[in-house]
Amino acid sequence: MPRENQKRGRRAAEKAEKDAAKRKREEVPEDSLPKRLKPSTDESTEINQGADYIPFDENYNENYDGNYDENQADAPAGDMPFYGLLDPEEQEYFSRANEVLELNQFQDAEERRIFIDSVYKEANGKELKIACSQGCSRLMEKLISMSDMRQIHRLFNKFIGHFMNLVQHRFASHCCETLFINAAPGVTQKVSKSKSDKMDVDEEEGEEPEPELSLAEMFIKVVEELEGNWGYLLTERFASHTIRVLLLVLAGEPVDVSANDSVVASRKKEKLGLPQGETQDGDVSAQKRSVPDVFEATLKKIMKDIVSVLDDTYLRALATHPVGNPVLQVLVSLELSHFGKSSAKDPNSITRRLIPDESFEEGSETTTFVRGLLYDPVGSRLLETIVRCMPGKAFKGLYKNFIRDQITSLARNITAGYVVLRVLERLGKDDLQNALERIVPQVPSLLERSRMVVPKVLIERCLVRGVDTAPLARALEEAYDKDPARRLEQILRLESTTQEDLEESEQKPKGANAAPSQSSTGEKLHGSLLAQTMLTAPGPISGLIYSSLLAQSSESLVKIAKDPTASRVLQQALTVPTSSAQFRRQFAPRFTSHLKELALDSSGSHVVDALWPATKDIFFIKERMAQELTQHEMALRDSFVGRAVWRNWAMDLYKRRRGEWAMKAKGIDNNNGSGERPKSRIELARAKFAAKAEEDAKKGAQKGVTA
């Protein structure tokens, strides 16, 4: 007889018991108090009221079942209120709405607006449930990002009175953050009625009263709700990022979540809202805004309250706290840049309490604290902010007494090196020259350790300050292979990528994902950025890259062009001002007979686009490339990136009106927008001679009159 299919062993039995307990928890309503449950298969086990409460554990489920207690005032002070669960039908509707917004297949903006209005009507009275729902909170974020100011105003009013709980919630905190960012531009605006409200004002009169408070007053209400809890919220896992946004909104500073150096949110944060290419009011979140005067007074009070409840020891401990450090960065940057660097002289200011001694003498308390931040992965980010924003006098003391003598060893360190970059950005010409002389001997070892960002920033600052880059060019040449072709492979990490691919294909088991390692991807990115920066420097530094590009074969160039990271170097080499006509005359023909392959590739198509401006003064090469593209018209039209290349090269104009295309290819039709042919050298000389003759004639006439 066939044996019953059973899993044996202690682990299988424990897993079966856990699954059974999980099913029972889903079927039976739990207590509405959000306590941390101990893993147990015994249903009779209960947690005592005196047990330690650890909020927002990783395994904590916000959407627990239970009845919503209307009288929240009688609830214990430390409890998180439960706003209820969505019905299965409601969850299904909002999930479908989320999918529709994600696909974004609306015919126009008006159709999307009507759909958003219908979702808001369905969500009326359920806003808090949706914000706290694991499955539907993303829909709330999308709705807020796509809403007009009137809808944001109404939603903000629904959240008033609940912000203390919402900002600490795993999912609702992100909705609060999105709400603050999108409501910020409206603090100085009068909310006008939208089209849908004007159309439905007769049919649905009195459906929902307009909020009495303005958006500015609502922000003040939020601050009043959170008042007295700042010290706790700074290090609260979910509330801290919302507090950062609130502080920046009150200051009128840009709140750009997408920026790489943003302290508002992690780089891994999911980008929700309008599709790419569509923005509301020109991406106002990344711009500075004017705010009411009451905001500045409120911000000062918040910062004063935060500092007053923290002693110096705890304040310095925040500098290395993973959650508290970003908030401290915002506070320091606002104190030094928004309120002026003179505010740092106040003995009770955050900067002064962190760094009481501006002389940075060896052995002092300040020096010990700064040295600890230098080598700490979290604390170094705060030190970067301090270096970027601190007053000039304090920066000079920091550089001369602490960093200058050890800048070489600091640049070699993977953590302290980023602080060195911020220091280099503030140095004057003489100090930068001195720092360059100290760092240049270490360039080969830096490149060997893949610390390519230090030479990159050195090149950029030398160009800005007018410092000679010849010593740096010699150091870069010595660091890489003498063979120009091999040099480019080493800079872009092409050879290491090929070896890794071969090893992975041999060693990886079948079915494993062939994802590149994060370290190799980062090295390739930094190598590409270094090469692009080298191309912007006139002289021997850019010559290292140009000679390497000319030494590559056509097959190698095609491989580089199809690499998403390395292809940027080719685009830069074709369009940067240091690219000479002689180089482009030799380099551009290397891509002929490969244009179809490149035009159909997502990365290579950008290189083909860059060939259009690069061949402006070598028309015969551009015409040869256009003929090659014409031969593969159907293949290009069947591809999304191919159609973009066809359009950017104006190939329809090439086929129908060859003469107009030739004028456009030579840049004639873009001459001051007049459509006139640019004058040749002989014509310019004639015009200059005629102007001089006319000027001499006028002078002769004036002399005759005076005589």
UniProtKB/Swiss-Prot annotation:
Pumilio repeat extents: 122-157, 158-193, 365-400, 401-437, 548-588, 590-627
InterPro entries for this protein: ARM-like, ARM-type_fold, NOP9, Pumilio_RNA-bd_rpt
SUPFAM superfamilies linked to this entry: ARM repeat
Record flagged with keyword Transmembrane helix: no
Stretches the record annotates as Disordered: 1-77, 268-287, 497-523
GO MF annotation terms: RNA binding
Function: RNA-binding nucleolar protein required for pre-rRNA processing. Involved in production of 18S rRNA and assembly of small ribosomal subunit.
Sequence similarity: Belongs to the NOP9 family.
Record's protein name: Nucleolar protein 9
